[in-house]
A protein has these predicted regions:
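Jelly-roll (double-stranded beta-helix
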Residues: 1-232
């Protein structure tokens, strides 16, 4: 089963400095049919104006993955971590028993991100933050694991959930496949381009909620950049 959630039908808010679209209920947007997808709780499509951002605020008991689509995001937190994550790269914050952080666009142009929240397997624990570059060339033609709670994914950023965040770049006409296990929930968004997911068309920034599909086959109709979450 694949349910398409068109970009134009997503919830959202325009705060001037922040233009946000919500694939699931978040802040002032509430849809009882879209409270999450398995352990995937939030997928926000954010556009952050230059020299603005989110001031310090708290989180707890959530795995927060930020995928930078354009520009760069600068992170600061109460543990003393600081870092700048550029387009195509990923940062992960395990909020654990509590952390405060801020995220700023210190760039001269708009920064565009996907922010993804996944519920952890267990509450509590020491909070942490990390970031890693993932060159788009390394993802050409196949899925690469960007963040994972599985020990076998040694090159991915670690998260505290039985979940994966994967990325791929596909030239028009190319295909990539991913095996989705029994009882798993997949959610796929094309950051750019246009794709077919098991024969169902998705335009850029549409979402596809995937369930009871043993294999996810993605064919690019245009040059495309894809993010997929595999969650319990």
């Amino acid at each position: 089963m694949i349910e398409v959630r068109s970009f134009n039908g997503l919830g959202g808010a325009d705060h001037g400095w922040l233009k946000a679209k919500h694939h699931f209920s978040f802040a002032g947007y509430h849809d009882p049919k879209r409270m999450g997808w398995g352990a995937l709780r939030v997928w926000n499509d954010d556009e952050i104006a230059p020299h603005t951002g989110f001031p310090p605020h708290p989180h707890a008991n959530m795995e927060i993955i930020t995928y930078v689509r354009d520009g760069a995001i600068t992170h600061e937190d109460s543990l003393g971590n600081k870092g700048r994550t550029e387009a195509g790269d990923v940062q992960v914050m395990s909020a654990g028993n509590g952390i405060r952080h801020a995220e700023y666009n210190r760039e001269p142009q708009t920064t565009r991100i996907f922010q993804i929240w996944i519920e952890p397997d267990r509450e509590g624990g020491k909070p942490s933050w990390g970031a890693k570059p993932f060159p788009k060339g390394d993802r050409a033609g196949s899925f690469v694991v960007l963040a994972s709670g599985f020990g076998t994914d040694a090159d991915a950023l670690p998260i505290r959930a039985e979940a994966r965040v994967l990325g791929a770049t596909l030239k028009a006409g190319a295909t990539a496949e991913y095996t989705l296990g029994n009882g798993r929930h997949g959610y796929l968004v094309a950051a750019e381009g246009e794709v077919e997911v098991n024969g169902i068309s998705l335009k850029a920034r549409d979402g596809a909620a995937i369930e009871d599909e043993s294999v996810v086959k993605v064919t690019a109709l245009k040059d495309s950049e894809i993010i997929l979450v595999d969650a319990a």
